[in-house]
């Protein structure tokens, strides 16, 4: 696990990532109870890799800045204020998440159904453009052209609706808060119109967090912060297997047998070759692995006495 923690740099070298965070209960031994801490996720869209990051359970802006200080490219996230630190960086382009905007407006249906349905209808129009592009199996370039032609005017209409509706509602109402959340994010949303690689929302990063929710239910909590760090590493590797369509059990069995060779100083091997997205090609060269003294080739985990 210790050697695996440096693999996070591989994910951050991509030029398009999605970032999110979720809670992780960790035992606080001073208070003798589980504290609500946070774990971050960085999802590289191409290649499809995940990196979970735990930094003493913090969700502060400093963690986000330290985590992504070397990243350059498109950064897709929700409206959490910690990401505002990247607003003035010329080498980072913040992209918005329409799913988060939709959830805020959808939460207003009981309070103000008329306005909520108006906003949701405009948002659905933007998603319909994505469905159309998917059905036509458009390339990234073709998708960008379609978005600019159809989604661009819809996004303009949605922005205008936000402007016109806000003065008509109470600022402290659910609708007022939803509009206050959505309107500043419109400039970030526009970036997806011009690059077909960028998704309309951050749902894929959120979906990658769902196993973490199940993990919380199964394990209840992490016993200490070291255990939380180990959890982040394990979730990074196994989550990447799922993203790449690799069987986690097969990957673990094969990689565990290879690690002794890769950790040998004279092997010349790079641990990144064992990441799930590169593992299939690496696996084909299994017969060329160097021999480790005292280790059986039939069973690399068995040391001859």
Region spans (language model):
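Single conserved hydrophobic/aromatic residue that forms the stacking wall/gate
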Residues: 1-11
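Two-metal-ion RNase H-like nuclease active-site motif
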Residues: 13-29, 77
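Beta-sheet entry/capping signal
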Residues: 14-17, 39, 49, 72-74, ...
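Conserved beta-strand -> loop -> alpha-helix junction used to position metal-binding or nucleic-acid-contacting
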Residues: 16, 79, 88-121
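Short helix/loop capping segments that flank catalytic or ligand/cofactor-binding pockets
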Residues: 26-28, 50-52, 61-62, 83-86, ...
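Short conserved beta-strand segments at catalytic cores or DNA/RNA-binding microdomains
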Residues: 33-47, 98, 241
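Electropositive, glycine- and tryptophan-enriched low-complexity nucleic-acid-binding patches
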Residues: 38-76, 104-106, 125-141
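Acidic/histidine-rich catalytic cores and adjacent linkers
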Residues: 70-73, 80-82, 121-305
């Amino acid at each position: 696990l210790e050697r695996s923690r440096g693999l996070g740099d591989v994910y951050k070298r991509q030029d398009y990532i999605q970032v999110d965070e979720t809670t992780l209960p960790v035992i606080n031994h001073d208070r003798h109870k589980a504290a609500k801490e946070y774990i971050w996720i960085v999802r590289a869209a191409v290649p499809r890799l995940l990196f979970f990051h735990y930094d003493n359970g913090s969700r502060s802006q400093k963690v986000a800045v330290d985590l992504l200080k070397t990243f350059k490219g498109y950064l897709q996230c929700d409206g959490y204020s910690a990401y505002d630190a990247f607003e003035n960086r010329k080498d980072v382009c913040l992209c918005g998440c329409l799913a988060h905007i939709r959830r805020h407006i959808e939460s207003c249906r009981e309070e103000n159904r008329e306005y909520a349905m108006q906003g949701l209808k405009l948002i659905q129009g933007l998603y319909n453009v994505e469905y159309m592009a998917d059905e036509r199996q458009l390339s990234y370039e073709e998708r960008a052209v379609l978005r600019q032609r159809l989604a661009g005017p819809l996004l303009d209409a949605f922005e205008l609706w936000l402007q016109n509706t806000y003065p008509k509602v109470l600022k402290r109402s659910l609708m007022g808060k939803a509009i206050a959340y959505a309107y500043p994010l419109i400039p970030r949303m526009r970036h997806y119109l011009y690059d077909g690689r960028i998704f309309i929302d951050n749902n894929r990063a959120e979906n990658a967090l769902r196993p973490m929710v199940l993990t919380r239910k199964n394990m209840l909590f992490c016993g200490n912060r070291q255990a939380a760090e180990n959890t982040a590493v394990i979730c990074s590797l196994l989550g990447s297997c799922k993203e790449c369509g690799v069987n986690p059990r097969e990957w673990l069995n094969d990689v565990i047998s290879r690690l002794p060779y890769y950790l040998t100083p004279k092997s010349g091997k790079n641990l990144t070759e064992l990441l799930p997205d590169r593992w299939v090609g690496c696996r084909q060269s299994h017969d060329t692995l160097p021999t480790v003294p005292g280790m059986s080739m039939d069973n690399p985990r068995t040391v001859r006495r």
